[in-house]
Regions:
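S-adenosylmethionine/decaboxylated-SAM
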Residues: 2-19, 23-194
Length: 194
């Protein structure tokens, strides 16, 4: 699926990821080699997950990690956590039909605990979009930093004034980080210093 069709489809999936952010996710996934491994922490209904799946090259692996606990049901437009999971299942089924060449795993665990299932230095990209508190992101980063290959990419969503803990922690841990223009996505490469 090309970028234009991917974005048009992704925008039918409810979520907070903007068109610019979706485009960046698609292009970043597309830039990886065949057989790459991408982990997304926090998938909600699957908007960014779908976009990454359409961007990845053949034989790549996409791992979605989410506890699917009812943390967002306090939002007025979310009637129940089952409603969220039903939407994600529909997106997941669509991806499986469209991208039979991908290896896809959905891990229903706490995002930091799920890192135990993944070998060290085996992941090309980890996209952090789960717990947006400083403490939660710190826990996820601590668990997932060893899993990323040298030269691999850490990136995350919601680097904005609505989540000051994300800004503080990312700036502290990754002083050379980059903020993608016109988005709230941050990125940093794993080096010997990470």
């Amino acid at each position: 699926m090309d970028l234009e069709m991917t974005l048009a489809t992704a925008e039918t999936i409810h979520g907070w990821t903007t068109a610019s952010e979706l485009e960046w996710l698609f292009q970043t996934a597309r830039s990886l080699p065949c057989g790459a491994v991408w982990v997304e922490l926090g998938v909600w209904k699957g908007r960014s997950f779908f976009t990454v799946a359409m961007g990845l090259r053949r034989r790549s692996k996409l791992i979605a990690v989410d506890s699917f606990t009812p943390t967002v049901t306090s939002l007025p437009f979310v009637p129940s956590q089952d409603w969220v999971q039903d939407h994600f299942r529909a997106v997941y089924s669509g991806i499986k039909r469209l991208r039979e060449d991908l290896r896809i795993e959905v891990v229903r665990l706490d995002t930091s605990e799920a890192s135990r299932l993944v070998p060290d230095a085996s992941v090309d990209v980890v996209y952090f979009d789960a717990d947006h508190s400083r403490e939660g992101l710190a826990k996820d980063l601590s668990a997932w930093i060893p899993k990323v290959k040298l030269g691999g990419l850490f990136c995350g969503h919601d680097y904005n004034e609505g989540f000051p803990g994300v800004i503080e922690l990312v700036d502290e841990l990754f002083p050379a980080r980059e903020i993608i223009p016109e988005t709230s996505i941050w990125q940093a490469r794993k080096s010997n210093m990470s």
